[in-house]
Amino acid sequence: MDIFQKCYEPSLAKELKAAGVYPYFHALQSRQDVEVMMEGKRRIMLGSNNYLGLTTALDVVEAGIHALEQYGAGCSGSRFLNGTLQMHLELEEELGKFLRKPGIVTFGTGFQSNVGIISALVGRHDYVICDRENHASIYAGCQMSYGKMLRYRHSDMADLEKQLQRVPEQNGALIVTDGVFSMGGDIAKLPEICALAKRYGARVMVDDAHGLGVLGEGGRGTASYFGLEDQVDVYMGTFSKSLASLGGYMAASEEVAEYVRHASRPFIFSASIPPANCATALAALRHLEQHPELVDRLRSLSLYARKGMTDRGMKIRESALNAPTPIIPIYTYETYHTLEVAKEIYDRGVYVNPTLPPATPEGEALLRTSYMATHTEALLDEAMDIMAEVLVEHE
């Protein structure tokens, strides 16, 4: 049989394109901002992870330009060999001080970070225990490791304890959870997770891709939000969301970080973060430190949007209803209905992300909306009016 046979067979993507409701790969002709030019038309952006709006901040953009002029376009090598810039070390040092974790390792992307951390830390005789709604990169890391993976029902602490009880006493265990869940916008039950980890001798890793710049003191993330910075062993995060760039990181003790530097194949065998991306991430981090009010503004706008949607009759996923995060999922349930609604909203000038199974449970398709500290109430009202109108028309 031809290994490419699957490429020629019918697929959901081909079906959606034929039906005129394919929702992916829309091209922008502008900067990533609260309003964008997308496919030749002005759209209000409610689908970006640019939570602090820093992709267009002048100091961030200028830092990238200066780095290109000083270091050139790329590093042409691994951090392990010729690809370490002085600026990489500065970024790691300043991020470590900000997160209050001395051991920082930076990776090329957030996805690569999870794969690189988990595959290095979880050995053949270890167990990794995951929330079912964790990001796909966490599962990729589990698959690349030699350990045994166990999963617990989403935010179900009784089921987490049940999985911990399955780990033999002589084996190591790592609990991995999103801090803020990327689809649902709800927050992990970190106090309970840390308590169970302590009881059963497990370690805790938090993927804070959507928590950095969003939660905690000055935007330090989910562990800071709960006052559990000393009880979370490993943070993972990304530079592509609140820090307006590209890349990812691990924050831990210096001993754990040093081990990962020498054991993580994705770290050792990948080129380092390019100069412009490194510089913009560092500039965005400094901007966040100088302007912690952005975190408060983001929270305020997120609450404004939640109230506005509820008042307009939109059904927000219950677990995210009162969460102080900028991710607000609107239930639309059936796949084709969701795509039709998303297309109509898009055609009327608002970009949202339709999210379908398997990214959601079957029958629970939704519109994932997300917000920036640089949105205005007037823009949100305009967007929410359009969404509510379309949802009523498609009931």
What are the language-model segments listed below?
Residues 200-203, 210, 215-324:
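Active-site C-terminal subdomain of aminotransferase-like
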Residues 117-136:
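Conserved PLP-anchoring active-site segment centered on the Schiff-base-forming lysine
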Residues 296-303, 310-349, 359, 364, ...:
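Conserved PLP-binding catalytic core of the aspartate aminotransferase-like
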Residues 150, 154-206:
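Active-site phosphate-binding strand-loop segment of PLP-dependent enzymes
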Residues 3, 58, 62-66, 70, ...:
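PLP-dependent enzyme catalytic core of the Aspartate aminotransferase-like
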Residues 5-73, 202:
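N-terminal "arm"/small-domain region of PLP-dependent enzymes with the aminotransferase-like
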Residues 62, 66-110:
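Conserved N-terminal alpha-helix of the aminotransferase class I/II PLP-enzyme fold
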